[in-house]
Regions:
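Small/polar-residue-rich segments within soluble enzyme cores
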Residues: 1-68
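Extracytoplasmic/periplasmic mature domains of Sec-exported, cell-envelope-associated bacterial proteins
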Residues: 28, 33, 95, 106-113
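Short, charged, low-complexity patches
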Residues: 28, 76, 80, 298, ...
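Amphipathic, well-packed alpha-helical segments that form the structural scaffold of globular domains
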Residues: 36, 40-43, 51-54, 84-92, ...
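N-terminal leader/targeting segments and the immediately adjacent pre-domain N-terminus
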Residues: 40-43, 67-91, 126, 447, ...
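Beta-lactam-recognizing serine transpeptidase/beta-lactamase-like catalytic domain environment
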Residues: 49-66, 75, 104, 109-168, ...
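Beta-lactamase-like hydrolase cores
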Residues: 81-109, 129
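Short, gly/Ser/Thr-rich active-site loops of penicillin-recognizing serine hydrolases
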Residues: 326-333, 426-455
Length: 455
C-alpha cells in the first residue's frame, strides 16, 4: 500500500499563517481546509480473490486512484517572511517605548498585503503564531496549552481579529461626506479646540486648528473636523458607504473570516436597546464606538481607494493544476466599480499622501527619505481601558501613489499609536520594491513565484 503525501513547497517557517494538514491528508485549517476538494483527489479501489490459505488467486482494479491537484497560492515567500519578522520585531520594539500612555503591553497583531490590481494576497501574518505540527504529533498537553494561551495564537487575526479602525476610518467618512454633498474638497471648516455636540463636550487632538479643508484634516488626523463633518453627513450615510466598501460582511477570501460590525442605529438598538444620538455619530466618525473591522477588510478598503473605486475579491488561491498540467481553476478576474466620483477620490488621496509626505503628516517621520510616494492613514483606537492598557495602533497604506501596486493594513494590539505600526509597512515595501540592497540582484517581484501545495 502506498501512502499519500502532501507537502507545502518552500512554506516551512510560515505554515501557521496559512495551512494545517491532519491525518489521512485532510486539511483542517486555513487554505488547505478551504481547498480540500481540490487537493484531496479520489481513492482507488482494488479487489483481491484469495483461497482458503489466504493466497491471492486473482485481483482487479475496480476504480483507479485519481491524484489530488496541485494548488498554487498567491503568497510570495520572501514578502511573507519579511511580514512575519517585521511584525514580531516591531511589536517587541513598541513594548519598550517610554511614554505615559504605553503600558508595555503590545502583544499581538496582524498584517495583510494585497495586490490592488487583482486582489491577490501577497503576504498575511498573524502574531503570535504557532507551529501546526503540534496537532500532527497529537500531544494533548501541548494542544491544550495552545488553546488556553491568553494571547490566542490559534486565531488568525488577519481575518478573524476585530478591531476598532480609529482614524483609518476617516477617509471613508470623507467619501461619505463628499458624495453626499455635505462638503467639497475645498470646503473649510472651523476647528476649535473644544465644542459641544449633542450635549457632550468634545476636544480636538490637534488643538485649535482654525479653518481647515479635508486634505489638512486627513494630514493631521483632526478629530474635531471629522466630529463635525460626520454629524453633518449623518450616521445613515456613513453606514451606507461603509457597506458599499464591504464592511460588516465577509470579503470572500477562501479561508475563515469574521464580519466585524458597523456602528449604526440598528446595532445600538439591537445590542443595547438604546436610541442613537449626535454624540454617537461623532464618535463613530473617528472609527470608534461599535465599529470593528478585520485587517483583511481594511486592506480591501484601502485597495479600493488606491485603484479608483475598483473592488476585487481578496484571494489566496492563484490556480489549481491537475496531473496533466491543465489549469482547472483560477479565481475570477472581474471587479465591482464603486460609484465614487474621481474628483472626490482624488481629494481623499491627496489627504492620504499628505499623511506620509508632508511635514505635519502623522506618519511622515516613519517614511522620511523614502524613495517614492506612499499614501496612508494612521489610526489609534481606544479599547476603553486606557487607564491600564495601551490603545491599539493601526496603519493602512498603498504605493506607489501615482500607479498603485500594493496595499497594506497592519494592526498591533496595544500598539499605543498608529504611527508606531508604520515601520512594518515600510519594511514590507522595501522588500516588495527590492529596495533592500541585499536583494537588488533578484529584480522586481514576480507574482508567478507563487507558493505551491503539491501531492
Amino acid at each position: 500500500q502506498e501512502e499519500m503525501e502532501r507537502y507545502n513547497k518552500e512554506l516551512e517557517g510560515v505554515e501557521g499563517s496559512v495551512p494545517y494538514t491532519a491525518s489521512d491528508i485532510v486539511g483542517k485549517m486555513g487554505i488547505e481546509a478551504a481547498a480540500e476538494p481540490i487537493l484531496r483527489g479520489i481513492r482507488g479501489e482494488t479487489f483481491r480473490e484469495v483461497d482458503e490459505n489466504g493466497k491471492t488467486t486473482a485481483s482487479y482494479v475496480e476504480r483507479p486512484a485519481v491524484p489530488g491537484q496541485d494548488l498554487y497560492l498567491t503568497i510570495d515567500l520572501d514578502l511573507q517572511k519579511v511580514a512575519v519578522e517585521s511584525l514580531e520585531r516591531n511589536i517587541k520594539r513598541i513594548r519598550q517605548i517610554e511614554h505615559k500612555k504605553n503600558f508595555g503591553d503590545a502583544n499581538a497583531g496582524a498584517v495583510v498585503v494585497m495586490d490592488v490590481n487583482n486582489g491577490e494576497i501577497l503576504a498575511m501574518a498573524s502574531y503570535p503564531d504557532f507551529d501546526p505540527r503540534v496537532f500532527l504529533e497529537n500531544n494533548v498537553a501541548a494542544i491544550n496549552e495552545l488553546w488556553n494561551n491568553p494571547n490566542a495564537p490559534v486565531v488568525n487575526r488577519a481575518t478573524s481579529g476585530n478591531y476598532a479602525p480609529g482614524s483609518t476610518y476617516k477617509p471613508l467618512v470623507a467619501i461619505a461626506a463628499l458624495e453626499s454633498g455635505v462638503i467639497t474638497p475645498n470646503t473649510r471648516i472651523n476647528v476649535p479646540y473644544k465644542e459641544e455636540i449633542g450635549n457632550m463636550i468634545f476636544t480636538n487632538n490637534g488643538g485649535n486648528q482654525g479653518r481647515i479643508n479635508l486634505e489638512h484634516a486627513l494630514e493631521t488626523s483632526s478629530n474635531m473636523f471629522f466630529y463635525k463633518v460626520g454629524v453633518q453627513t449623518g450616521i445613515d450615510n456613513i453606514v451606507k458607504w461603509a457597506k458599499i466598501f464591504g464592511f460588516g460582511r465577509k470579503t470572500g477570501i477562501e479561508i475563515g473570516e469574521t464580519i466585524g460590525s458597523i456602528a449604526s442605529k440598528e446595532y445600538k438598538r439591537q445590542y443595547f436597546g438604546e436610541d442613537w444620538y449626535p454624540a454617537n455619530t461623532a464618535m463613530a466618525s473617528i472609527g470608534q464606538l461599535y465599529n470593528a473591522f478585520t485587517p483583511i477588510q481594511l486592506v480591501n478598503y484601502v485597495s479600493i481607494i488606491a485603484n479608483d473605486g475598483k473592488k476585487f475579491t481578496p484571494h489566496l488561491i492563484k490556480m489549481a493544476v491537475d496531473e496533466s498540467g491543465t489549469i482547472t481553476y483560477e479565481p475570477p478576474k472581474d471587479y465591482e466599480q464603486l460609484p465614487i466620483s474621481q474628483k472626490n477620490l482624488d481629494a481623499v488621496k491627496r489627504g492620504m499622501i499628505a499623511v506620509v509626505n508632508s511635514e505635519d503628516g502623522t506618519a511622515a517621520e516613519q517614511f522620511k527619505d523614502f524613495p517614492f510616494d506612499v499614501a496612508g492613514k494612521t489610526g489609534t483606537s481606544e479599547t476603553g481601558r486606557e487607564a491600564t492598557e495601551s490603545s491599539n495602533g493601526l496603519f493602512v497604506c498603498y504605493a506607489p501613489y501615482e500607479k498603485p501596486e500594493i496595499a497594506i493594513a497592519v494592526v498591533v494590539e496595544h500598539g499605543v499609536w498608529g504611527r508606531e505600526t508604520a515601520p512594518i509597512c515600510r519594511d514590507i515595501m522595501m522588500e516588495y520594491f527590492r529596495l533592500n540592497k541585499e536583494r537588488q540582484n533578484k529584480g522586481a517581484y514576480n507574482s508567478e513565484d507563487a507558493i505551491e501545495i503539491i501531492w
